[in-house]
Amino acid sequence: MDPSPDRRLPVTVLSGFLGAGKTTVLNHLLHNREGRRIAVIVNDMSEVNIDAGLIERGEAGGDGGPDGGFSRVEERMVEMSNGCICCTLREDLLVEVARLAGERRFDHLVIESTGISEPLPVAETFTFEDEEGRCLGDLARLDSMVTVVDVARFLDDLGSVDDLAQRGEHLGEEDERTVADLLVDQVEFADLLVLNKTDLVDADRLARTEDVLRRLNRGAELVRAERGRVPLDRLLDTGRFDFDRASEHPGWLQVLRGEEEPETEEYGIGSFAYRRRRPFHPQRLWDAVHAAWPGVVRSKGFFWLASRPGLVGEWSTAGPIVNLGAVGTWWATVPREEWPADRAVRARLERDWHEVYGDRRQELVFIGQDLDRDALVARLDAALMTDVELAAGERAWWGLPDPWPRWAEDELQRHGRHGRRSSLAA
């Protein structure tokens, strides 16, 4: 007996940095929808919602009628311009999507998120329950997470040290994110990367951009586009999205797990994992981090600082920006009776256990162009504790010179995502 069809409203989320061309992609989709009844939710952070205005007036492309090529009877536009999907509007988004899904007259819903929102929290919205216990996933399903990339600017923006605030786009005074951080977040969680504006770059730059994107997200499909023209079957009813798979897309995670590396490194784009079982000296690591890291585009992982022996450090760099903060505590500092009962978790702990240091270790992945692996490894090794320093014992480690800012307790909850950062030297 065939399973009953999934009648939930399929949803495509369009993400991408400001100016990447999300609205152009959306307009092309609406003008070439092949008879589908499409609902649209537009979310823009600007005080004047220019993108929504372009869609309403049909000025962003296409050859439709006075309503921009789509009928108000067939399509419904919900314009949400008072906040970000992933933050202030999570509950409002739930209400709007639930209403559209409940009408059961649309074939698909497209959500155009703001240019400064991260895809992961948007996806998590579909598991969010409101005060009445309503869950969006009961009425709608994520079909695809699409990130539009401006190939003419991506590599330059990835190498920028600009804050979002410096670009005039941020969520408030506490939003310390950088352009590079956001670009990486948007790329790593997507299942489709639209390389837009390919007509504005030469073949070499396009190929280098593609290679970097494949290293950042090995699980995503890539499609080239000019002026936002993407085939409809790449955007709608794809069945691509899977939350667990999306969480495993980042290239750094696959390298860390030892998954097979491509045999060739086109355009010098490569990656490697750095693993060690002794802690970093805090002062020497500080000095190493604040020197130049030639060619590094992205690095990610976990590290162990001798002066903070119980805390798991999270290492994350995007372009020239490095974020280091606390992400939790090592199991080595937790009594075994308090370990999880789950056998798989315990098996992993036992597999990675060191007789002296427990699960504490260094695990970092570096992705970049023309990486001098030997030089990077030598620099990191020089920052490790020496045999003499290790022999002094953990009590002595607490007194080591430590220039790192204090890792606040709230960082353990925020996973260091928006914590204190430094700029790597150029």
Spell out what each predicted region is.
Residues 51, 96, 122, 209, ...:
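Hydrophobic side chains in well-ordered alpha-helices
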Residues 24, 28, 99, 121, ...:
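Alpha-helical scaffold segments in soluble metabolic enzymes
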Residues 2-3, 163-363, 371-373, 382-426:
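C-terminal accessory "lid"/substrate-recognition subdomains
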Residues 53-59, 211-213, 378-381:
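Short, aromatic/basic amphipathic alpha-helical patches
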Residues 2-15, 20, 24-181:
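Nucleotide-state-sensitive switch-loop elements of NTP-binding domains
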